[in-house]
Amino acid sequence: MLMSTLPGGVILVFILVGLACIAIISTIIYRKWQARQRGLQRF
């Protein structure tokens, strides 16, 4: 019942916030992976 009362803009905002969170988490994981790769190259 809540979905019928919500306007389309609110759903778009939720989708954009979710994509932003996924992008931030993926960049953090990518930076940690890069640091790990550099650490392996040193040894």
Curated annotation (Swiss-Prot):
It comes from the Eukaryota. Residues 30-43 are cytoplasmic. The keyword Amino-acid biosynthesis does not apply. Residues 1-5 form a propeptide. Pfam families: PMP1_2 (PF08114). The chain crosses the membrane at residues 9-29. Present with 74700 molecules/cell in log phase SD medium. Monomer and homodimer. Associated with the 100 kDa subunit of the plasma membrane H(+)-ATPase. This is Plasma membrane ATPase proteolipid 2. It comes from Saccharomyces cerevisiae (strain ATCC 204508 / S288c). The gene is PMP2.
